[in-house]
Curated annotation (Swiss-Prot):
Name of the protein this chain belongs to: Homeobox protein Hox-C11a
DNA-binding region listed in the record: 250-309
Keywords of the record: Developmental protein, DNA-binding, Homeobox, Nucleus, Transcription, Transcription regulation
Residue ranges with Low complexity bias: 188-200
Amino acid sequence: MFNSVNLGNFCSQTRKDRTSEFGDRTGCASNIYLPSCTYYVPEFSAVSSFLPQATSRQISYPYSTNLSQVQPVRDVSYGLDPASKWHRSNYASCYSGEDLVHRDCLPPSTMTEMLMKNESVYSHHHHHHTHPGSNHPSAGFYSGVGKNNVLPQGFDRFFETAYCSSTDNQSDICLQKGEGGKQESDSQQPQQPQQQRQQPSAALAGASEQEKDPGDEEEQTNSGSCSTSSPAATKEGNAGKSSHSSTPRTRKKRCPYSKFQIRELEREFFFNVYINKEKRLQLSRMLNLTDRQVKIWFQNRRMKEKKLSRDRLQYFSGNPLL
C-alpha cells in the first residue's frame, strides 16, 4: 500500500512536469501507460485535467472553430434518430411523415398489413379524381401499391384488374365481395331464365335438401315429380315463371329448420317413410311448423334417400371385394 502512495505522488509529479514541458502535445499524455506506476483512484481525482485550460497555451487550428455540431457516428450506425438519417434525408421533400414512418419501420408480417398501411397515405395524394358518389370499397387498398412504388412496376398489371377506374362510366363499378368479387352489371336479366331453366333439373336430381324454404319447395313440386299437384297448378306455375322471366326475380328469404325440428323429423322418417295426415298434423303442432312444411320436408327426404341408395349401390357394385 505504501508503494502505491509513493508511486502515486511520483505519477503526479511526472504529470506536472510533462504538462509544463510538453504543453503543445497534451493529447498524447493521456495515452501513455506506465507499468511501474500503480493507478490509485483517489489520487486521480485530485489531479487537474489534461485538456488545455485558459492559462495553457492556445493552439491555432488550421480550420475554423465555429463549425456546426456533427452528429456522432454511433447514432447514425445504430439508427437512434431515424428521422435525421443521412440516407433518408433526400426523401423528406417527397414524402409525408407517415410515409417515412412506414419506410423506417420493419416490414409487416403480411402483404395485407403493408397494403392497409399505405392506403391512408395514398388516398390523400391520388384520390382527388374519384366521384363522391361512387362505391369504392377497396380502390385505395389495391391501387396504393402499384402507384407509390412500394412494389416494382412489374406488379402493376396485377393491381389494374382488381379495381375500376370509374372515370369513363360511373355505373360500371366493381363491387368486390368476400366470396368472389362478382361484378354487378346490366347482364342480370339474361341470367334469370338460365337460373329458372336449371330449377326443374335440380328438382329432379337433387330436390332432397333438408333446408328448403316453402317457396322454393313449391316451385319444385310444381315443376315435376310430384303426383299430388294438379295440371291446373302446373299451368299456373308455368305462367308465373313466364311472368317472372320478364321482371327480375327476388328470392325469398330462406328459413332453415332448427336442429330440434330436424331431429324430430328424422326420427319420424326412420319409422315411417310415408307419413299420414294425422301424424303430419301432430308433428306440425309439436314443431311449430305448417302442415305444408312437414309434407314437403318428407318429400325432399324421400328424394334424398333415393339418391343415397343409388349412390350406395353404385359404390358397392364398383368394388368387387365388397
